[in-house]
Amino acid sequence: MQELERKSCDRPVELVKAQYAGKKVIEFYGDYIPEQWIRAIGAEPYLICKGGEPQAPEATLDYSLRFMNPLAATMVGNYLIGADRVMPMADAVVIQQHDCHYGRMTEILEFKGLPIYKVGVPADFAVGISQQYYRHELREFKKFLENLVGVTLDEDKVRENYAKTNKIHELLRKIDELRKVENPPITFSEFIRLNHYTLRVDYDTSIEALTKIYEKLKDAPGAHAKNAPRILMMGRAVAEGDYVVPGIVEAAGGCIACDFLDEAIRPYRTNISLEGDIVDAFAEALYDTRDPQCIFQPSWEIRFERLKEYIKEYNIDAILWYQLAFDEIYDMEYTCYSKWLKELNIPIMKLESSYEYSREATAPLATRLESFVESVKEAK
């Protein structure tokens, strides 16, 4: 894992060298942007995935109301304070437009003169016209890439990248399966880092590293205390760097054995078809048939049925609802889930984060989480 971390941290330096050698650098945000196409056409991708620091969201207040979730605000704030080393040099910044938070933040980047390209992602994902619209947006993105780089997208290379993506997801699923045992050999803090690192590092390096990690983990002892309460973490995202909350839970004796997160994590439960049209294959896997995000509709009942499956499969004792500040749609979904889970006698705790982890803020946060873990222990 240390090698993956090092390569992930070194990625901006690699991009400078690649751009100097004549390659295009494309920074992007979101699962609905086909990174596989960016690599296939000969450009260098870099995912926007940072979070967990209050300075970046605060930097956007001169340009926007404060009522934007901190992950979306961090995307802009890191540029404003100079913490994003890639965005100033990027030949294009591609951002999916799937809700108002990212739409508003994208407008600020446009106002600052950055080379923004938007990919629309309709929220009513089950409707035929929305599925057609998203495919249209992908085809327009393909044209944009070809115009930017100056070559035609090689569809065989795209399928090769789909296959490598599927292999990465297969290995992450195998590691995830180990989390179903009574005492998993990997913590959530480690698992989410694997996701973040492989989102930045090239496919072959990721596959090699994940293969070695799985071989080591499959016979490894448990990484948690005996009879630790098994917790499922659900919400929009645990971004790169936003590791305080899972760290506190694990230090308190909890085991985050499963995750149900919408963004800033590999969609490792999906596979992309290697047959047929590359646009249809990507759209079907990531948009049509994947578990919908909270902000999509209809989704809450679909997601709750999936949640019940995870509770059973992973032998979950409690749910930690990790919500980003000002994410009002997640707040409404939580209201439904708290009622439905009460009927199943599954405890749930909502934790809202604005990425404020000062000593003064962390102390009461730790007390809440430690009390939650202890109460779940007592109820086991």
Feature locations, PLM:
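Short hydrophobic segments within beta-strands
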Residues: Y29, L232-M234, Y322
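Redox- and metal-dependent alpha/beta enzyme cores, enriched for Fe-S-associated oxidoreductases
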Residues: D31-Y32, W37-G52, A56-T60, R236-S299, ...
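A charged, amphipathic alpha-helical module
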Residues: M1-K24, K143-N271, W300
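Glycine-rich, highly charged phosphate/nucleotide-binding loops
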Residues: R66-D84, I295-K308
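Metallocofactor- and cofactor-centric catalytic cores in central/energy metabolism, strongly enriched
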Residues: R6-Q19, E27-D31, E35-Q36, Q55-D62, ...
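C-terminal hydrophobic structural anchor segments
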Residues: P298-N345, M349
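Acidic/His-rich segments in extracytoplasmic proteins that coordinate ligands and/or metal ions
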Residues: T74-N147
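Peripheral docking tails and interdomain loops at the edges
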Residues: T335-K380
